[in-house]
Each structure stands twice: as structure tokens, then as C-alpha cells.
UniProtKB/Swiss-Prot annotation:
It comes from Acetivibrio thermocellus (strain ATCC 27405 / DSM 1237 / JCM 9322 / NBRC 103400 / NCIMB 10682 / NRRL B-4536 / VPI 7372). It comes from the Bacteria. PANTHER family: RECOMBINATION PROTEIN RECR. Residues 81-176 form the Toprim domain. This is Recombination protein RecR.
Length: 199
């Protein structure tokens, strides 16, 4: 039995469906929305609706955009000879935050995961190969996640790219800046050692 009026209970229930939102947080959000002025509630609802309706995937890289070709792909300031391959549009945001990468991206929209029934044909590998075969690409940086699925995807892609004569690299994994070696796990230490570079 709910202690709330049906519309409030439904709002709480909908908030609970969001990732990382438990019952208590859902209640707080629902009551916060109820306390908001109607104008702010309307703006929030419109922003959600507009984002859902107007956002699509870039026809070139698969990143989220509101145009056919995203601003990154259409920018003349980006190096189109280097493509960084990521699993998810959120990974593009993470890479852009460091302001180091000046090339283009390719979003796979997933990783190979036989346990979840996701094979190479279920993610955007063919589209990546098509971009490479256009001839302008000199390097592909594979930046999939450092987990079993990400590593399997990286290996699969690198084997497909190798015959095309394009340099293929994998981002290094290792000790975070400010971290202590004693707290790092064996895999992280091994990856850090493997990804070492000359100074």
C-alpha cells in the first residue's frame, strides 16, 4: 500500500527506474519537483522531451548529436587521419575533457560479449572498417574499456585492421596519477609496466 497519492507514487516509481537512483533518492527528487514552480517543471519536462526527440547519432562517427554530422567530425581543426575507437558516446566526452586528442572518434555502441549475446556484427565495427578503407586514416587508437569485453573487442578490431596497413595502437592502462604502487592490483601494475614509455 502506497502512502502517497497515485501521481506522486508514479513519479517516485519513474525516478527509481533511473540508474543509481534508489527509493529514498527517488522520493527526494519527486518532492523537489513538486516544490518547484510550474515554470521550472515545464522547462525540465521540455528539456527531457527535446533531448530525447532531437538527439541522434552522427552519420560518420556514431556520437550523439543534433545534426547529421556532429561538430567534431565536421570541424576542420580535427586531424582526420587519426581515429580513436570508443565503446560509448560518454567515452567521447571523457576523452574530450582531457583536451589532448585532436583526431576524430568512432563509437562502437558496445563491446563484444558472447555471454550477453553481443557479437562483432552487433556493434559498429563494419562502419569503422568502411571509414578506414576510404584511405585517409593513418592511425587507429583503440580506447575500449580495460575489461574482458573491451580487451576482446580491441584484439578483434586490431586483427581486422592489420591487413589494411594502418597503424593500430591501444591506450595504456596503469597507475593513476597520485596513486601508490602498494594499492594497485596485479593487472593494473602489469599493464602499467607493459605500457611504459621512454623519458
Amino acid at each position: 500500500m502506497s502512502f502517497y497519492a497515485a501521481p506522486i507514487a508514479r513519479l517516485i516509481e519513474e525516478f527509481e527506474k533511473l540508474p543509481g537512483i534508489g527509493h529514498k533518492t527517488a522520493q527526494r527528487l519527486a518532492f523537489y519537483v513538486l516544490d518547484m514552480p510550474q515554470e521550472k517543471v515545464d522547462r525540465l519536462a521540455n528539456a527531457i522531451t527535446e533531448a530525447k526527440q532531437k538527439t541522434k547519432f552522427c552519420s560518420v562517427c556514431g556520437n550523439l548529436t543534433d545534426t547529421d554530422v556532429c561538430p567534431l567530425c565536421s570541424s576542420e581543426k580535427r586531424d582526420s587521419s587519426v581515429i580513436c575507437v570508443v565503446e560509448d558516446p560518454r567515452d567521447v566526452v571523457a576523452m574530450e575533457k582531457i583536451r589532448e586528442f585532436k583526431g576524430l572518434y568512432h563509437v562502437l555502441h558496445g563491446a563484444i560479449s558472447p555471454m550477453q549475446g553481443i557479437g562483432p556484427e552487433d556493434i559498429k565495427i563494419k562502419e569503422l572498417l568502411d571509414r578506414i578503407k576510404e584511405g585517409n586514416v593513418k592511425e587507429v587508437i583503440i580506447a575500449t574499456n580495460p575489461n574482458i569485453e573491451g580487451e576482446a573487442t580491441a584484439m578483434y578490431i586490431s586483427k581486422l585492421i592489420k591487413p589494411l596497413g594502418v597503424k593500430t595502437t591501444r591506450i595504456a592502462h596503469g597507475i593513476p596519477v597520485g596513486g601508490d604502487l602498494e594499492y594497485a592490483d596485479e593487472v593494473t601494475l602489469a599493464k602499467a609496466l607493459e605500457g611504459r614509455r621512454e623519458i
